[in-house]
Amino acid sequence: MAAGPQSSGAAVSAAAYPDSPVELPARLQKGAMRRRFWGVFNCLCAGAFGALAAAAAKLAFGSQVNIGLCVLGIVAMASANSLMWTFFSRGLSFSMSSAIASVTVTFSNILCSAILGYLLYGECQEILWWGGVFLILCGLTLIHRKFPPTWKESKEQ
């Protein structure tokens, strides 16, 4: 018996169709939007857990804290930090760029820190601080935005 190459009907190689592109662009691949959503979601969660860790540390090492509250704050800080790094690494794996993931985590952390600071400690932020948050949000929007290719770039292809 001669064992010849067996081909299944489902597997078609790219060599059979030499004029077809080998791979679609990343934005057109199956599940690209879903991956992008989960990347952003994980990065937002990482920022929130980072802010929660900072709030727990402030609670644990405050000026008038008993030993039980201090231990509880340290455990909460360690747990929130480990969750933050877990979500950040998952966000990096889903994200198309580490810059996008880093800026998303930073924005989420700053915003959640402001909210937790107001809710837990009654802290209010200055208008200049909110202006900085707005500029970070503008930069984040520009990073997440995908510009269409220019006429010159499309002509070269």
From Swiss-Prot:
Subcellular location: Membrane
Keyword Cell inner membrane assigned: no
Organism domain of life: Eukaryota
Entry's transmembrane regions: 37-57, 67-87, 100-120, 124-144
Gene Ontology CC terms, in alphabetical order: membrane
Protein's UniProt keywords contain Membrane: yes
Database matches in SUPFAM superfamilies: Multidrug resistance efflux transporter EmrE
Topology in membrane: Multi-pass membrane protein
Coiled coil: none
Family annotation (InterPro entries): TMEM42
Record key words, sorted: Membrane, Transmembrane, Transmembrane helix
Protein name (database record): Transmembrane protein 42
Organism lineage string: Eukaryota, Metazoa, Chordata, Craniata, Vertebrata
